[in-house]
UniProtKB/Swiss-Prot annotation:
Protein name: Tachykinins
UniProt-annotated location(s): Secreted
Purpose of the protein: Tachykinins are active peptides which excite neurons, evoke behavioral responses, are potent vasodilators and secretagogues, and contract (directly or indirectly) many smooth muscles.
Family per record: Belongs to the tachykinin family.
Biological processes, Gene Ontology terms: neuropeptide signaling pathway
GO cellular component: extracellular region
Alphabetized UniProt keyword annotations: Amidation, Cleavage on pair of basic residues, Neuropeptide, Secreted, Signal
Expressed in which tissues: Tachykinin-related peptide 1: Expressed in antennal lobe (AL) and gnathal ganglion (GNG) (at protein level). Expression in AL detected in all animals, in GNG in most animals (at protein level). Not expressed in corpora cardiaca (CC) and corpora allata (CA) (at protein level). Tachykinin-related peptide 2: Expressed in antennal lobe (AL) corpora cardiaca (CC) and corpora allata (CA) with expression detected in few animals (at protein level). Not expressed in gnathal ganglion (GNG) (at protein level).
Residues annotated as signal peptide: 1-21
Residue list for modification Lysine amide: K61
Residues excised as propeptide: 22-25, 39-50, 65-163, 180-183, 203-223, 239-251
Presence of keyword Signal: yes
Principal place of residence: secreted
Length: 251
């Protein structure tokens, strides 16, 4: 009798706690600023969560639709910033010679300068400016110094084939230019110093065995070279006509 009554009381307590828990509304903690996950909203309740752009909005976050720009290009027209001094790109002018599209200021020379040559007829609208330009061009064509011209005419003409003279000895550090070889042989060897040796190889092709033996003999003009201590190889190969030449050579 006691056990069923205890079970009934326990079940009753559980049902009461579940019913009370459903009636209590849960509130978010204080200071809650974000949400983990996403909420599902119907299309009717989206407007209340619309985020407006912040105040003092300067730029655009994202890209603009090309269709909106084509439909209303006046709304998306960008004007140059204050103090704009330059231009990115070039303007296409139909007539490059015309100066009507350029803004003219007070004292500006745009459209007033005659760029034609002296052979062409000057513009009668600007006689003073044309005269000044012709005078300036004549000064450029004329010699700058008549004295230099007269002194140069008195000097005899010199060709570029002459040798160049070096500077002072205490300031000379090398050869400036090239020396003429007209008065010298193309392979003049007189400038060399003491003869030391010949860097090359001996010609054994046209020599016989007696000549080679005389040259490499110990008492001959060219004593035979002995191998170095620890010599294990040879740099290159020697070529001889007779294969038994080494047998005749003294050790």
């Amino acid at each position: 009798m006691g056990a069923p009554r205890t079970c009934l009381i326990f079940i009753t307590i559980q049902l009461v706690s579940l019913a009370y828990a459903q009636e209590v509304s849960k509130r978010v903690p204080q200071g809650f600023l974000g949400m983990r996950g996403k909420k599902y909203f119907d299309e009717e309740g989206i407007e209340q969560f619309y985020k407006r752009k912040p105040q003092f909005f300067v730029g655009v976050k994202g890209k603009k639709s090309l269709q909106d720009i084509l439909e209303a290009p006046e709304e998306y027209y960008k004007r140059a910033p204050m103090g704009f001094m330059g231009m990115r790109g070039k303007k296409d002018l139909g007539d490059s010679q015309s100066t009507e599209l350029f803004p003219k200021r007070d004292g500006s020379l745009i459209g007033k300068i005659d760029y034609s040559s002296k052979e062409e007829n000057a513009d009668p609208d600007f006689p003073i400016l044309n005269e000044l330009l012709l005078q300036y061009l004549s000064q450029l064509d004329a010699p700058r110094n008549t004295y230099m011209q007269s002194s140069e005419s008195m000097e005899p003409e010199q060709s570029n084939d002459l040798d160049k003279r070096a500077a002072n000895f205490n300031q000379f550090y090398g050869v400036r230019g090239k020396k003429s070889i007209n008065n010298k042989r193309p392979y003049d060897l007189t400038f060399r110093g003491k003869f030391i040796g010949v860097r090359g190889k001996k010609d054994l092709k046209n020599s016989n065995a007696h000549e080679i033996k005389f040259l490499v003999d110990q008492n001959g003009p060219l004593p035979k070279r002995k191998a170095q201590m620890g010599f294990f190889g040879m740099r290159g190969k020697k070529w001889t006509d007779e294969p038994s030449l080494e047998m005749d050579m003294p050790n």
